[in-house]
Each structure stands twice: as C-alpha cells, then as structure tokens.
C-alpha cells in the first residue's frame, strides 16, 4: 500500500511517520528545500496540552472590539472584503457561545492528551534531540478579573483529567525565578505541570532523518501542480517531479490546504491567521524563563530553549501578507522586555512570521473528505506542534480502519450544515 502526503510541516511529517509505521510506503511532497521551513519554522515552542483552547470563546467578540483600539492588542484585523474571511469570521463568532466552546475545547484537549502520549512514546523509542523540556507552562495574570475568568477553563481541565495548580504571586516566582523583579505586575498564575517545550524545527529535522531511515521518500523543492481525480477518488498527483500514484493521499499543507482542496470542489474553513515570533539569545540564565510563561493580557508566550528565548504571539487576519510591521515587532518585544527585561541580548533578536491554519472552532480537520481515498490533517491553528504526534497517529488509525470514521467530529463534515 502506498501513501502520498502533501506537506512536510510538523503535521504532515507526523502523518507520514505513523503511516509508515502502519505499513504504508510513503512519499512526502514539499515545495521547500527541507521539512518545517514555513509555519513550523519558528513557532512559539510550546507543547501546550492543557492550554489547548479555541480562540472562539465567550467574551471574545467584546474583547475583539476593544483590541481594535489598543496599541499592543493580541488581535489585529486588516480591513478586507474577502468573502472567505467574512464567512470564516461569521462561523467563528457562532462558536463563541459557551456551549460550543465547551464542546470544542473538549475535542482539542482529547487530541492534545493523545499527542502527549504519542510524543512520550516516541522519545522512549528514539533518541531525538530538539532542546525539549518537560517543565510545564505558567500562565500569568495581571488583573483580578483574569483570575476569576480562568475558572471556566479550570472546570474543563478537571473534566479532562489535566493536572493544574493555581498559584499565588510568590508561587509564580518560585516556579519562574526570573519574574521576581516584576512580581508587582502580577496577581497570580495557573501552572500546568504536564506541558512541554521544544524547538519544533529541530524536532522536524530529526524526524525527517528517522523517517528516511525507515524508508519514507521526501520530494523537496517540488511543487504540487494538480490533484487528479476519477469518479469519487484521487488517481494521482501531478508534481514537478512527475506523476505520483498511491492508494491514499493526505493533504497537510496548513493554510494552503484550502486553495488546493477548492480546486477539487471541497470547501474547508481554514484561514491563515498570521502570527509573529522573535528569538533572543540568552545573556543571563537566572533572568530568563525556565520553561514557558504565558502572558494572559497580551496572549504572548515566552519559551525557553537551551540558550535562546522564543517569544511568540499576536493573531492577525491579513491573508497571506508576509510583511513584518514594526508595530508587531514592538508588541512582542514589549512583552519580553516587560517580564524578563535582563534576560537576553535584544539587539540580536530575530523576527519571523508564519500563517497558522485556523478553523472557526479551533479544532483541526482530521479525517475523510468526499473523495474516498483523500484525507486531511490541517487546521491546527496555534497548536500544530502540540497536536502533531496525536493527529498523525489518529489519522493513520482512521486510514487503516483501527479508529472510527469520524472520532469526536474531527473531519470536515462537521461543517456540512
């Protein structure tokens, strides 16, 4: 049995990995020269199982209106009459109801927890080095209102069996000593001990080598020209490297999956939500984060690698615009300077932007399509690194028949109505 996977970001890569483990002869196609050269390249570095939450949440519509007027707001919207964006935004607003939020978060937590198990097993079986740490995530709050608002999430964490700890300011400092100088800015925190961190790009390079050793073929610098169909199935994929034929095909091209599937008459509600990051070399380890610190006010994550800090945040609805405006640089720079002002050499900060493939409900699209041998694994938003291993394993189970056809409503058919 043969499989073709389109896309070698972390999600496509793990789709290929688990398909080869299931016995498939796998070929991966990517337009870049290496795996993870696009959205997986410089993400936040969080593997945030407990923080797997949809952006569509109660109160977000009101917050979004306020954020439009703030200089360092976590959400920015570039005015547009793009019908895809308007439809996506309408669907997202519909998912801000509490009942929908609870369903969506429960789905996301289920995938994330499964992914934790898969990544743990992967580390046990293979010697992979990606500057990973298993030291949890600390979400810090700056207002009493934020402390109260987090209770609804804590209830869902309890339902899913996710471990957590409410923390006073003193406990936050004990967990992250680098915050001591700014303790007066904090009101408390929420600590999730089972969360992890790691450089997604390094992980992908390691996994590419492992996959190649297991017989997976990678066609880099190769563009997908056309997906060819006959009846209700795919018969081949036309690429720069020629025609590829397989028994099953997987679209894992992140935000670019939408346009490819549209050519086949398949509509998916995945929109590119632009995110930004900066990477700072550490100059004083005692002043740097130990693991990941989440700033609830600005929705920015600060993650420790070995000798670097990765700072990532901001959601911008601007289509596929690759520009990095100075205002976005200022926002993420402000947060790291505010919380860890003496941690790194900010003059050497490297900025990056990527397009997160976001669905309106936050839950990825994993599973079947109207074409019987075509599958999707996309739409993970900010959680591609968190969910990649679990999503890849789950997809392989769906394809091989080990798993139900539509576990927890994860495939695109939940949008059929």
From Swiss-Prot:
Signal peptide: none
Domain of life: Bacteria
Cofactor: FAD
Residues binding FAD, per UniProt: 3-17
EC numbers: 1.4.99.-
Cellular component aspect of the GO annotation: cytoplasm; plasma membrane
Molecular function in Gene Ontology: D-amino-acid dehydrogenase activity
Function description: Oxidative deamination of D-amino acids.
Name the UniProt record assigns to this protein: D-amino acid dehydrogenase
